[in-house]
Amino acid sequence: MAASTVLSTDDVAPRDRAPAWREWIFSHFGGLESDLYGDTDFDGHMAASHAGDVILTKLEANRHRVLRSPHLARASDTPYLKIVAPWQGSATVEQQGRQACARDGGWVIYDTTGSYAIANPERVEHLIVMLPKDQMAERGVRLGDLMARHVGGASGISRVALETMRTTYQELPNMSADAARGAGELIMQLVRLSLLELAGQETAMTQRAALKDRIRDHVARHLRDPDLSVEGI
């Protein structure tokens, strides 16, 4: 059976819940600041288990935001790629000037070695998956270009990855250590495949955008040319 960590504000005095939650978030996720949108009432629960080197955490909480500053990112000991996959509510991830939002049936990936912010503007139930970054490198794929992206989850390999992450978390209490390790390795492989697919989609979109730019530039330069035609473009 995989070892687990359970944290809950149920046994904490109401006035102490917010600071306790901030401390748990900071400790469990390796340096993460949080705030509660100014709310004074709060309740939250976290349950985390390991599938080999993969950490899976179910988080239930009132609305809150988290922030990883550049200083905290630099001070981190272990680099992870991190996934948020909501069961309830939404999560909006900001990193590297990009923003991506996920709800039930979707997931977003980001990098703990860089600064980021996540908004959870309503009560949420999230599955948060942490994958060792040094095991996720894929030849020919620039991971940085894929961070803060909505990877998917509705169909294809990204849906297989999502369902595997969810099922693994739910079944970890019934797994041996070896089985849990194998499940973690499977999750990493499915996420790699999802990122490869996303990289291909991003490349195709970039190529289409570049073609449109070239067409607009050609038309602008030859707008007064009587020989300008669709065939010429």
Predicted regions and their residues:
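Alpha-helical bundle regulatory/interaction domains
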Residues: M1-H45, V54, S90-G232
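Glycine- and acidic-residue-biased ligand/ion/polar-headgroup-sensing regions
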Residues: G52-V54, A61-V66, H71-V93, G106
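Generic beta-structure capping elements
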Residues: L59, P86, P132-D134
